[in-house]
Amino acid sequence: SDKPFATLVKVQEVVVAGDVVYINPGTYVVPANQVPMTTTNSGLYHCVFHMNKSGEAGKPISYLANPNKQGRPIFDLSQVKPKDQRITVFYVTGSNLYLKGFDVIGTQVTITGHTQSECFRIVKGANNNKFEDLRTHDGMAIGFYLLGGSNNHILNCDAYNNYDSVSEGGKGGNVDGFGGHINSSSVGEGKGTGNVFEGCRAWYNSDDGFDLINCFEAG
């Protein structure tokens, strides 16, 4: 289109099952004053983008780097520093979504006590999603934090150069590349199976590359 949408916030107002959203290459600096699409946990989590729309089986909603243009889209979160809140860049509650080919950089931490931020937070009810060739790097946040949902496929994604210099004296103890934390309390009613990390790489993260400490089952 000669009049593309400027933000994912606007995109989320209009997408429906079967739509393909092409993201042009370039760096998208999220402004400090952008209102979060939602907050969770009594306001503790500042969720920049809420991926709450769902596709259907065989008709996913796709968010893809534009294959007709050279270069990667980069979402730069370095200006987003909400006081006393944890930052989640992509809060995923929808199902049958396909995200591919972009970067998330510069995600911040503002709380000086025990805390964490996340680039992707996937929760119960988010099922049958595919995350491919996504890079989360050069920030203070966990790359992927999987808390719930079933049959989510995280494929060939990278998390690197992430270190939290702000909380707990800058020890960086909560910044994992990938976290799979589906436990018995978050599963409920037999949900929470079939999630796969495949071909993912993690390096130079200040805590674990892959953390399954709270996962009820891993194979």
Predicted regions and their residues:
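Right-handed parallel beta-helix/beta-spiral solenoid domain characteristic of secreted/periplasmic
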Residues: 25, 29-42, 47-115, 163
